[in-house]
């Protein structure tokens, strides 16, 4: 126990330097020393605010079991004296600290049961939120008028408390998930300048978030997470009742039904609150018995398991097998299935729900009691973990001091006894979870004995070859396979693997060998799989995933057999193995218009303030979507143009998200630039060039982009740290590039190429639209005009989009000497071929050889530059080659035969390049391929350009 004593003495000395502790009674001194040893949070709170200890002891709060009335009246009294928001922020933070110290003190010293703690933590949060909301609502009514509906009825502000706050079971150090709403549209009354209710309540919501979430010298009250609102981060901060109802009826998803079970309305009593409480019941609780909820919960649990593996979480009492989340899923499965017919199940709290399940006979009482016991045990552990440092953690500690703190509070004399009890409780929970929600998937048959011996025994080369030959491989192939397998075994011996991992590997490999031997080139496939196995050998969770899911193992081998690139991707990022569990999803990429929504959903699980996790998650999302696209591509369920569409739309969704978070970071630091104050614009655009602009991205494509901002940006930002608007946009661009190019565990997001901006590498990072246009008109080379043909805005607002499109059309449509243009393009093409073509005699470079893809792209650009002065609107509309050729045919610039030959050749060459890329092969092929296509392109080129 010396570690606890040392910690207590250290904190006691620091506290004694701030306040005289000699007057403490012996019992008070004993309690203080105990709690200082157990909690850094309590110690640091008392050191920051020494008078707090005297206050608590004098008022006997530390010995009071029911403190709800004290919390309410004390907070009302403190807020009644508040005159401004700065003071409000301070009062809320100090009040929260004081009462959280009381909660921690009582629970850590065994004075309070878990139920008391959960009750008071949740009640404290309710009062802080409600009284903060009430003060700000009144203040804003004085400033902007009272919000009314069209009938002149005052409109109140309501909050959905979600998650554990909604269920009144908030944990000690927790985010609070909120959704804001108000009843009806209308305007404010009482001030000369009226504003609409949406604007009033949006501003109020922002002030409430600031009052609770913002970190000041006194800390914060709660981390506020608003991402569960309709349409997530891309949706408005607040919506009215009608819009909320419409959203959940039209767009509500299974996970939102699950989330809304615990949604509790906070706000003033009355008809509006009653209406709101009834509003979403039809969405959450179906009138029929809804067994589809089981599959939805199963998928959600699979996503959580995937996250645990992805983050490498170990000993996580919330998300791990048998953790708190599985208990919640058990209870909520019954609520979703039967809650529409059994109103008793429409309750918010987990403990209450479990008790109801026993009362109505849905689950035997002894099993409910087992779940309740486990829940109380796990939540008690969670509270202690969080009371140590007021940190949101559910992972068991790995340092001896915190381990000792945990077992001391939990009543154990050693770690092993505690850990055994914890595992026993979690095993019980997982068994119950499997009974209610577990997957019915049958385990695969074990591979036959011979293959088990091949893997487990040290057979000679001759014996292994003979065994494989008997399994159907020809003798030469069997010998090569035996050699490759022996090499794999030798490599695995060099890698650390525990007993559990070794046992799993020994079960997995015979089955894997059996499946590999069915393929035409099992040696090559084994070599591809070897790289993955070496990467995951020390990560037992992934070995278990493949061993326990035969379907996932089969999908893995199929994809790796078809594509070296996919095999390498899986080896570099084994987190993607989780995506193999659902073949229906795997071969069905996200719909083009849904990438933004899917990205928002994926990012919901990541704390907004944790930029490192945000960057990592963005890369994981991209890799997952790449896998879906590649799988569908390999399966030929989508064709080449669709592959490029998917890759391009994905890049645009990621670009949109990155710009948004970069913008929020900049605004948080410097405020809004003056040119957009009072609007929802950013005055900023990203222009995609090259393959991104032409909607022709491949798997390894860079993003060629140019950044633009508004023309008139004189002035500065309106934040506490004001900077010039020009500097704001420059730093915004730098931030965007950093978010894309920073290397995390999952690599970079995309390579960003800025060389096509005005003046190239020597040019400024962000240009105004006017200076961009001026440069292109007066200083740009012909090749820059060619590049402009494939340019389009990929992030923008309407105003800046219109200006960019006008600039692009003006430049592309300017009159040119077509003969001189043809000469320039021809000369440029010859230079490129000389420096970039890789083919040798008897070979063909799909990209650079005569008749190759670049010839076709240059020809499309020539057609636009040569003829846009006569038909600019039509020719400047598209940035992709195929639609440019189609437009030229409609305008009479190409014959139907010429259009077909060009598009046919371009698609064939791109498809071939694409297939080679999937297997990480060079674009150089034998010279006897695509002869007719090449001749067609050369003939058309010569007709127009020679």
Swiss-Prot record:
Residues covered by region (Adenylyl transferase): 448-946
Residue ranges of the TM segments: none
An example Gene Ontology biological process: regulation of glutamine family amino acid metabolic process
UniProt keyword terms in alphabetical order: ATP-binding, Magnesium, Multifunctional enzyme, Nucleotide-binding, Nucleotidyltransferase, Transferase
Reaction catalysis annotation: [glutamine synthetase]-O(4)-(5'-adenylyl)-L-tyrosine + phosphate = [glutamine synthetase]-L-tyrosine + ADP; [glutamine synthetase]-L-tyrosine + ATP = [glutamine synthetase]-O(4)-(5'-adenylyl)-L-tyrosine + diphosphate
EC number(s) reported in the record: 2.7.7.89, 2.7.7.42
GO CC annotations on file: cytosol
Broad enzyme group: transferase
Pfam families recorded: GlnD_UR_UTase, GlnE
GO function term, MF aspect, one: magnesium ion binding
Region of interest (Adenylyl removase), residue spans: 1-441
S-S bonds: none
Entry keyword annotation includes Heme: no
InterPro entries reported in the protein's UniProt record: GlnE, GlnE_rpt_dom, NT_sf, PII_UdlTrfase/GS_AdlTrfase
Family: Belongs to the GlnE family.
Protein's job: Involved in the regulation of glutamine synthetase GlnA, a key enzyme in the process to assimilate ammonia. When cellular nitrogen levels are high, the C-terminal adenylyl transferase (AT) inactivates GlnA by covalent transfer of an adenylyl group from ATP to specific tyrosine residue of GlnA, thus reducing its activity. Conversely, when nitrogen levels are low, the N-terminal adenylyl removase (AR) activates GlnA by removing the adenylyl group by phosphorolysis, increasing its activity.
NCBIfam families referenced in this protein's UniProt entry, alphabetically: PRK11072.1 (NF008292)
Name of the featured protein: Bifunctional glutamine synthetase adenylyltransferase/adenylyl-removing enzyme
Organism: Psychromonas ingrahamii (strain DSM 17664 / CCUG 51855 / 37)
Encoding gene, per UniProt annotation: glnE
